[in-house]
Amino acid sequence: MKMIVGLGNIGTRYDETRHNAGFMVVEQLARDFHLGAFTHEKVEAVTVTGLINGQKVMLVKPTTFMNESGRAVKPLMEYYDIALDDLIVVSDDLDMPVGKIKLKQRGASGGHNGLKSLIDHLGTREFNRVKLGIDHPKFGSVVSHVLGRFDTEERPVFEGAVLQAEQALIKWVQGTSFDQLMNEYN
């Protein structure tokens, strides 16, 4: 089974905010493949499991809030015996413009607290990521920016990135190597 973890903050207050880019991608997958509603797991996450083009996949949204995402993901990986190669984490990225996606095999957190939590809890940087650009704030604080919503000009551009990320994830689930996907999407 493959596991796709979307990072974000749980609760209606955070719906559709920039920091919830990961949630938006896994929600799009769940909708498009009619996987049903996310339900509470034994750990601090909501999940939905089903088939994407014949392959078993678990979509995960941690309920720990962004900065503690690893606390939810590690026990799920252990319980379901998910190898690091069968994990992809989807997150936002301040250092990329809205509408851009980047696939990355490993590395540091880049200042992203959700990724930092995953690295700390998993004990490794060796996991695949799909990052969606949310850009730096034009004015105001970074916190206000990441917890804010896309404006009317940015929204359709970001939605295009969500669909592009979804297509990359579908190809990965179907067996395309992550190296090939990086060549195609980066």
From Swiss-Prot:
TRNA binds at residues 14, 65, 67, 113. The keyword Disulfide bond does not apply. One of its GO terms (molecular function) is peptidyl-tRNA hydrolase activity. Disulfide bonds: none annotated. Keywords: Cytoplasm, Hydrolase, RNA-binding, tRNA-binding. The record marks 92 as: Stabilizes the basic form of H active site to accept a proton. It is found in: Cytoplasm. Its main location: cytoplasm. GO terms for biological process: protein quality control for misfolded or incompletely synthesized proteins; rescue of stalled ribosome. It catalyses: an N-acyl-L-alpha-aminoacyl-tRNA + H2O = an N-acyl-L-amino acid + a tRNA + H(+). Its EC number is 3.1.1.29. The active site is at residue 19. It holds the Pfam family Pept_tRNA_hydro. It comes from the Bacteria. One of its GO terms (cellular component) is cytoplasm. Gene3D superfamilies: Peptidyl-tRNA hydrolase. The record marks 9 as: Discriminates between blocked and unblocked aminoacyl-tRNA. Monomer. HAMAP family: Pept_tRNA_hydro_bact. Belongs to the PTH family. Hydrolyzes ribosome-free peptidyl-tRNAs (with 1 or more amino acids incorporated), which drop off the ribosome during protein synthesis, or as a result of ribosome stalling. This is Peptidyl-tRNA hydrolase. The gene is pth.
